[in-house]
Amino acid sequence: MPNWCENQATIQVPERFIAEALSCVLDDNRQVYEDYRKDIPEGRGLPFWGEQPLGLLGFFFPEPDYDGGDKELANDSVHHTFPDWYSWRVNNWGTKWEVDVEHYTREDNDDGSSTFFLYFDSAWSPPLGVYDAIHAKSNQGYSIYAIYIEGGMGFCGEYDNGSDNSYELGSRDTTDVPAHLQEEYSWHYDYMEENEEEEAVNG
C-alpha cells in the first residue's frame, strides 16, 4: 500500500460546458456525461469515458488506449514497447492511480468561467503532471493552484500556475516551510511534537 499524499486544489475552467462535464465526472454520472458530450459538436475536446472509470486526473490528462496502442505497434516493422498503465501514469500524471475526490465545491463566475475547490488523496506524491497539463492551457482561461502534504515521507508543497515548490517538513524550529503552509498543516507539527514528548517521557 502507498503512503497517501493529501491535496487541496483550486482549478478554474473557462466555460460552463467544461464545468458541467467535470461535475459529471466528479459525481460519477457516466451516462449524463456521455449524453452531454454527444450534444456538443465533436465533443469539444472532452475525453471519452472508456471502460475504465474517468476521474479528475484523466479528465485533464487523458490516458492512452493501452490495448489499441499494443495492436497498432504489433503491426509496426520496428519493435516498440507501448507503456503499461503504471509507467504511463507515473511518468505523466506523477502518481500511479486515479484519485477519488473526497469533497468538492463549485462556483460559477460572472464571466462564464467556473472555479472548483477539491480535496483528494493521491498515491505517494501529488499529480504534478496533471497540474502542468492544466497550466499549459492557461492562455485558454484555465488556472491551477494546489497545496499538498505527504507526512509519511516528510514533505509538503505548493503549486501555483506552473511553479512547484516542495519542502521538507522538518520541525517547526528547523523547517523552511513557509508560514502559511505551517499554519495549514499545524496538525502535522502538533502530532510530531506530541510523539516526541511521549518518547521523552517513556525513555
Q: Model-predicted segments: where are they?
A:
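Intrinsic low-complexity, intrinsically disordered or marginally ordered coil/linker segments
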Residues: 1-203
